[in-house]
A protein has these predicted regions:
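Gly/Ser-rich catalytic/binding loops embedded in alpha/beta enzyme cores
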Residues: 1-128
Length: 128
């Protein structure tokens, strides 16, 4: 799958040089392939992302509209499991979005999944 910068993908979408549905279809094929190799996602949000892009009206000024995004699994995402890779949060489904998630959604970012992380973001530090 070809990789684009945000600006490149935005321009392709706005100029109708790429079909957003086909792009996301190919993107999720790649996500599923890489998930089997790397186990990089805690949650994959294919249905939500595909539903989201159906409703989008993209203009030249809205640079993030239609752009796929991945959030670490410690950011609250309303209605989508948020575990922070912790057993004690394995069933937690937030009733609100984190402020940064809300801002990115308002800009038109389409969530494709929640990425794995060290439990509760408490990984080993290597700073001196």
């Amino acid at each position: 799958m070809k990789v684009y910068s945000i600006e490149e993908l935005h321009n392709l979408i706005v100029n109708q040089e790429i079909d957003l549905n086909e792009y996301y279809y190919d993107l999720f094929k790649e996500v599923e392939f890489q998930q089997n190799r790397l186990n990089a996602f805690v949650t994959i949000t294919k249905t939500q992302a595909m539903d989201n892009i159906k409703e989008l009206k993209i203009s030249d000024e809205e640079i993030l509209k239609g752009i796929p995004g991945v959030f670490k699994d410690n950011y609250n995402t309303k209605g989508i499991k948020t575990t922070a890779s912790s057993k004690m949060l394995e069933d937690y489904v937030p009733v609100y979005d984190a402020a940064v998630v809300e801002k990115l959604y308002n800009e038109g970012v389409s969530l494709i999944g929640k990425s794995s992380m060290d439990e509760l973001a408490m990984g080993v530090l290597t700073n001196p």
